[in-house]
Design a protein with these regions (language model features):
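Amphipathic alpha-helical assembly/interaction segments
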Residues: 1-158
């Protein structure tokens, strides 16, 4: 089984795919004659597309700091969908509020899967994040002793 096939079996990936399908269904139901709704539709679609893509990106490697960067992006886009979908509630006559609540419930389910998924990341396999945002707890920054000096590996007879 390929790494991508394994990723597709993850509950968080499957939930991300479901959210994409739900957003697509909601977007298809929005009236075409409202510019604001069309803008919201495009934002929601873009956000929903990012979820499975970034999960696959995080699963493609095992470096903690890179996985956390992807996780932060996933969180941002999931929260954006939640906000955009919630904003649609003000369109009483055109939007099915039960469907909106269903999507928001699925985002909450996604959030719970997300928490478990992030907790599964290997914190011992990291590259130091100079911005110090994605370093695992207790990570020690590199020192000058840790740096690479090309001259250390050159034969002095040359």
């Amino acid at each position: 089984m390929s790494n991508y096939e394994k990723t597709q079996q993850l509950p968080i990936y499957q939930k991300a795919e479901l959210l994409f399908q739900l957003v697509e269904s909601l977007a298809a139901s929005l009236p075409e004659d409202n510019e604001l709704l069309q803008s919201i539709k495009e934002i929601m679609r873009a956000d929903a597309m990012m979820l499975p893509a970034k999960i696959a990106g995080a699963e493609a490697g095992n470096i903690y700091s890179i996985r956390m960067q992807n996780a932060a992006i996933i969180r941002f886009h999931a929260m954006s969908i939640y906000t955009q979908v919630g904003g649609l509630r003000m369109y009483d006559d055109t939007i099915d509020k039960k469907f909106i609540q269903h999507i928001r419930t699925e985002i909450e389910n996604f959030r719970l899967l997300f928490i478990n998924w992030v907790q599964s990341f290997d914190t011992s396999n990291y590259i130091w994040d100079e911005w110090e945002l994605f370093n695992p707890k207790g990570a020690i920054p590199p020192t000058d002793v840790d740096s690479f000096d090309f001259d250390d590996y050159m034969d002095e007879s040359n």
